[in-house]
């Protein structure tokens, strides 16, 4: 399994349907649920980004307990939001937590590979696994196709292609041949 988290809509819906305390109780690991709620409250009150991030990851990983999860991805909505807000240290915090707590590699999903890769390098996330739009016609590829090709050829990154078919604009064989070369 390759979990992708945190799924923000799930938390918003749960808080709306069940209230904040019940939502926290449902998503926090059962062992130490009270301490988890206290930690969540403390992290939110102090705006402790690392504590909040760890709680969200741990809550999501609860459903994968006992399963092999070699890579844990941070969802693109969160990645690109943190990038845009300039909270770049959160990427290092996520990477460190995923490695130390789950013995997994961190992965990042983004709509802007060039910008994110620069930030990850500055944060010390070496040779990251990054899932981004990569396709033959440059569909939704921030910076354009030539820049992505240059990055993939010259920089330390392990890319995973999404939107390979460019939202149906490319025939499957042509699309797959491009990303596999």
Task: Show where each model-derived region lies.
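Active-site beta->alpha loop and helix N-cap motifs at the rims of alpha/beta catalytic domains
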Residues: 1-85
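Beta/alpha (TIM)-barrel catalytic core signal, keyed to glycine-rich beta->alpha loops juxtaposed to Asp/Glu
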Residues: 65-66, 70, 78-181
